[in-house]
Amino acid sequence: MNTCTPNIKPSYDYNDLLASGRGELFGSEGPQLPAPSMLMMDRITKITDKEGLFEKGYIEAELDINQDLPFFGCHFIGDPVMPGCLGLDAMWQLVGFYLGWVGGKGKGRALGVGEVKFTGQILPTAKKVIYRINMKRVINRKLVMGLADGEVEVDGRIIYTATDLKVGLFQDTTSF
């Protein structure tokens, strides 16, 4: 674990995630999470640099589901479902958070994904979404980049999987 990075903990509550969105968690040069309503998690329940399927790091987060979440009112009227792209974005958000947690500096940007599979949906009647990210590699050169596999579970059932999630940290995003 990088002990030089401020606010390193094994878990984070909602207020911590909001602080990340304001640029307060990992310092002024560290990556930020988005603010609500694009923040796709309520808490990070576990983060470690040693565990996971590849023993390169693991992060787990949760989102409490309720019918008042903003996307249910418009996606779709009469047939509310959480957009699958928001679950994918949540996984990218967590890879970026991990890069800040291990000391990476820069502005986070999603760079791609190898493969995504959707085998279920998140409805307003669901209770809880769990995101799991297994880090495969962190490249720490001129560009800091994380590579990970992830999954999204709703109420005990895995409904999305993603391989080779890529997030980079950029010092300058003007030419990105």
From Swiss-Prot:
<keyword id="KW-0275">Fatty acid biosynthesis</keyword>
<dbReference type="Pfam" id="PF07977">
    <property type="entry name" value="FabA"/>
</dbReference>
<comment type="pathway">
    <text>Lipid metabolism; fatty acid biosynthesis.</text>
</comment>
<dbReference type="GO" id="GO:0006636">
    <property type="term" value="P:unsaturated fatty acid biosynthetic process"/>
</dbReference>
<keyword id="KW-0444">Lipid biosynthesis</keyword>
<dbReference type="InterPro" id="IPR013114">
    <property type="entry name" value="FabA_FabZ"/>
</dbReference>
<keyword id="KW-0963">Cytoplasm</keyword>
<dbReference type="GO" id="GO:0034017">
    <property type="term" value="F:trans-2-decenoyl-acyl-carrier-protein isomerase activity"/>
</dbReference>
<keyword id="KW-0456">Lyase</keyword>
<keyword id="KW-0443">Lipid metabolism</keyword>
<feature type="active site">
    <location>
        <position position="75"/>
    </location>
</feature>
<dbReference type="GO" id="GO:0019171">
    <property type="term" value="F:(3R)-hydroxyacyl-[acyl-carrier-protein] dehydratase activity"/>
</dbReference>
<keyword id="KW-0413">Isomerase</keyword>
<keyword id="KW-0276">Fatty acid metabolism</keyword>
<comment type="similarity">
    <text>Belongs to the thioester dehydratase family. FabA subfamily.</text>
</comment>
<comment type="function">
    <text>Necessary for the introduction of cis unsaturation into fatty acids. Catalyzes the dehydration of (3R)-3-hydroxydecanoyl-ACP to E-(2)-decenoyl-ACP and then its isomerization to Z-(3)-decenoyl-ACP. Can catalyze the dehydratase reaction for beta-hydroxyacyl-ACPs with saturated chain lengths up to 16:0, being most active on intermediate chain length.</text>
</comment>
<comment type="subunit">
    <text>Homodimer.</text>
</comment>
<dbReference type="GO" id="GO:0005737">
    <property type="term" value="C:cytoplasm"/>
</dbReference>
<dbReference type="InterPro" id="IPR010083">
    <property type="entry name" value="FabA"/>
</dbReference>
<protein>
    <recommendedName>
        <fullName>3-hydroxydecanoyl-[acyl-carrier-protein] dehydratase</fullName>
        <ecNumber>4.2.1.59</ecNumber>
        <ecNumber>5.3.3.14</ecNumber>
    </recommendedName>
</protein>
<dbReference type="InterPro" id="IPR029069">
    <property type="entry name" value="HotDog_dom_sf"/>
</dbReference>
